[in-house]
Amino acid sequence: MLLSLLFLLSTFAFGALTQPVPAKSENNVQFLHSKNKKRFYDYSTELIRGVNIGGWLLLEPYITPSLFEAFRTDENSDAGIPVDEYHYCEALGSEVAESRLEAHWSTFYTEQDFKNIASAGLNMVRIPIGYWAFKTLDSDPYVTGKQESYLDKAIQWSKDAGLKVWVDLHGAPGSQNGFDNSGLRDHWSFLEDENLNLTKEVIKYLLEKYSREEYLDTVIGIELINEPLGPVLDMDKLKEYYQFGYDYLRNELGSDQIVVIHDAFEAYNYWDSTLTVEDGSWGVVVDHHHYQCFSSDQLARSIDEHVSVACEWGTGVLTESHWTVAGEWSAALTDCAKWINGVGYGARYDGSFTKDSESSYYIGSCENNEDVSTWSEERKSNNRKYVEAQLDAFELRGGWIFWCYKTETTVEWDLQRLMYSGLFPQPVTDRQYPNQCGF
């Protein structure tokens, strides 16, 4: 999830393009599949239609607010409520935190969920997990060593249901972005030596384990790090980290597993010069995340403007040389979901957002936001239009992975509720508003 600092990135210009997908060429990494005859998933011909398993093995307050509401002492204030998993574990202590998290892990997702995902016409899941599941810093309060067994269960459930999997390193020590979904909010020091060294230890373990023969028919990508916040990071060091992960996989392990790199919120084609064919690289996916709800300017757009931007997300990647997938996106046209911007921050949409020097203004009401039965027909149709435009755009290239499959209370971020309410196509190819983008 792309949260509190992301509004800084909302001013990117999305220029509409009309080029077709480029012809197969040895200069395009995504087209080396046929040349190398590798067994990996061919993202140029096999479309991804997936969903994220968010808020399970790595907590996000807005996905499971009940875990965090247990700390509330004042119905009018979020004071004292942990803002992320780090502070959740710190507040409870290791024994109680482990007990509560075990109860969450064992119930929030079960095998039936993965069967339901497949039955809904999807073919892939992306599973976020934090570094602390495998190893921690001495000062970390996290519960560790327990999440991996659930990850392995999920991979087996996926295999049994006919789903493919991305294993996504979603949180790095020191945080890579300052978002609560990294485990530690308002920090971004993962490229400091101690933190980077531990990140490398963890990613080496993930690459080694999930590139083994028994996983290769199901795990079709390992994401080296989720959403590194490019504007506040040393991009040269980030590129070195990406190169490290790629080299370890190809040269040390000799594996043809797929490497997934997030775009770090850089512009289209930025990564064309990284892990290139000329350097001998292949089997690389660039992961783009797209939202229009984390700045007041975005929230104030008309539905036609929202749809136009969504369409440009599709055309914008047509000339990128790597495989590309939209690894996160949602139906959100508001930021009204409780704690979507973080515990204690409010919503820009209704003007209640405050953080540091940033304020907000009233755009619309958040009342009854999570009760679809109260929505106007116009609002329902607008959400459906927005979803369909994104589906059309993302299927111009490698496909999409919706964020996320389920939450405790939200609608715009909950694929189950959206499908049940008729706001997400079923089947996923159904269109009430065809040809919005004119592709």
Curated annotation (Swiss-Prot):
Family per similarity comment: Belongs to the glycosyl hydrolase 5 (cellulase A) family.
GO CC, any one term: cell surface
Function statement: Beta-glucanases participate in the metabolism of beta-glucan, the main structural component of the cell wall. It could also function biosynthetically as a transglycosylase.
One Pfam family from the record: Cellulase
Gene3D superfamilies, A to Z: Glycosidases (3.20.20.80)
Active site: E227 (proton donor), E328 (nucleophile)
Protein name in UniProt: Glucan 1,3-beta-glucosidase
Covalent S-S links between cysteines: C311-C437, C336-C366
Reactions performed catalytically: Successive hydrolysis of beta-D-glucose units from the non-reducing ends of (1->3)-beta-D-glucans, releasing alpha-glucose
Keywords, comma-separated and alphabetical: Cell wall biogenesis/degradation, Disulfide bond, Glycosidase, Hydrolase, Secreted, Signal, Zymogen
Family annotation (SUPFAM superfamilies): (Trans)glycosidases
Subcellular location: Secreted
Example GO molecular function: glucan exo-1,3-beta-glucosidase activity
InterPro entries per record: Glyco_hydro_5 (IPR001547), Glyco_hydro_5_CS (IPR018087), Glycoside_hydrolase_SF (IPR017853), Glycosyl_hydrolase_5 (IPR050386)
Secretion signal span: 1-18
Enzyme Commission no: 3.2.1.58
One GO BP annotation of this record: glucan catabolic process
